[in-house]
Amino acid sequence: MLSALARPAGAALRRSFSTSXQNNAKVAVLGASGGIGQPLSLLLKNSPLVSRLTLYDIAHTPGVAADLSHIETRATVKGYLGPEQLPDCLKGCDVVVIPAGVPRKPGMTRDDLFNTNATIVATLTAACAQHCPDAMICIISNPVNSTIPITAEVFKKHGVYNPNKIFGVTTLDIVRANAFVAELKGLDPARVSVPVIGGHAGKTIIPLISQCTPKVDFPQDQLSTLTGRIQEAGTEVVKAKAGAGSATLSMAYAGARFVFSLVDAMNGKEGVVECSFVKSQETDCPYFSTPLLLGKKGIEKNLGIGKISPFEEKMIAEAIPELKASIKKGEEFVKNMK
């Protein structure tokens, strides 16, 4: 069922660069001047699916917008600077993508970003709840395992919560899993599709290699190494950049892939499947990432975990306590906000 619905990785991204698909999606990027925000905005500007791109940040957005506006694609671009301009940036938006926040430095976990990024996400999502309550909200800001519960609680406070429209963007985990499996097996990565479930940090990232399309087999030691590499791939990039940032280019690609899939589904395209960290009843965790069938109104159907191996079952059991703690931390943050 799942593999039949899942299209090859990156198909939405490639299609968005072709001229056949036409649409009028109005997309906002909050945190558009940052390391992820700039390349993400470039990919969105390059897509015929997007008709209006509004960019928000606390610095440099007029420059980023001016630069992007010279590109010969149809999306109009406008930059907005500072909190007083945020409402105008959000009005009429169909999709809001939030990569805002501080990046990881060597030695930091995603959870170390909590104190700074929790406040940023709570502030930005409160503005979304007020000025574009019906938009699809895509959260990239880490720690996603906590920032999605924060977003949900903020929307509840404003009385506009719709769990089918709030997404934690975990797509980079899938993109990495596809790339690493393809590398090991000598396959074309565009033809590999590995569902990744759970959360978006360390051992909560659970690649379901047993469900990979095409089917692949690894000896247990190689499977354990591959799984560990997928889980710690973000740290691999942080270390390689030696203090100069975290994964920005691959994250921008993954964020764009998710947005294009979402817009495709909103346009009525059928069979669009992406994994995302969302409100869930698949486990006893209130939020969990699984493959989702996307539709015109967001999540059309949660496709669940499916058939998994004992190794994957064990990973889920080990991930759940950490996931629950991160979720609770996010929920408590909003409850304690003044």
UniProtKB/Swiss-Prot annotation:
Reactions listed under catalytic activity: (S)-malate + NAD(+) = oxaloacetate + NADH + H(+)
Residues recorded as bearing Phosphoserine in the entry: 246, 326
GO cellular component, one term: cytoplasm
GO MF annotations, alphabetized: L-malate dehydrogenase (NAD+) activity; protein homodimerization activity; protein-folding chaperone binding
List of residues that carry N6-acetyllysine: 78, 91, 165, 185, 215, 239, 296, 301, 307, 314, 324, 328-329, 335
Protein name: Malate dehydrogenase, mitochondrial
Binding site for substrate: 104, 110, 142, 176
Residues recorded with modification N6-malonyllysine: 239, 307, 329
PROSITE patterns to which the protein is assigned, alphabetical: MDH (PS00068)
Keywords attached to this entry: Acetylation, Glycoprotein, Mitochondrion, NAD, Oxidoreductase, Phosphoprotein, Transit peptide, Tricarboxylic acid cycle
Catalytic residues, chain numbering: 200 (proton acceptor)
Superkingdom of this protein's organism: Eukaryota
CDD domains assigned: MDH_glyoxysomal_mitochondrial
Glycan attachment positions: 33
Classification lineage: Eukaryota, Metazoa, Chordata, Craniata, Vertebrata
Positions of modified residues (N6-succinyllysine): 78, 91, 185, 203, 215, 239, 269, 296, 301, 307, 314, 324, 328, 335
Posttranslational modification: Acetylation is enhanced after treatment either with trichostin A (TCA) or with nicotinamide (NAM) with the appearance of tri- and tetraacetylations. Glucose also increases acetylation.
This enzyme's EC code(s): 1.1.1.37
Assigned protein family: Belongs to the LDH/MDH superfamily. MDH type 1 family.
Subcellular location: Mitochondrion matrix
Self-association state and partner proteins as the record states: Homodimer.
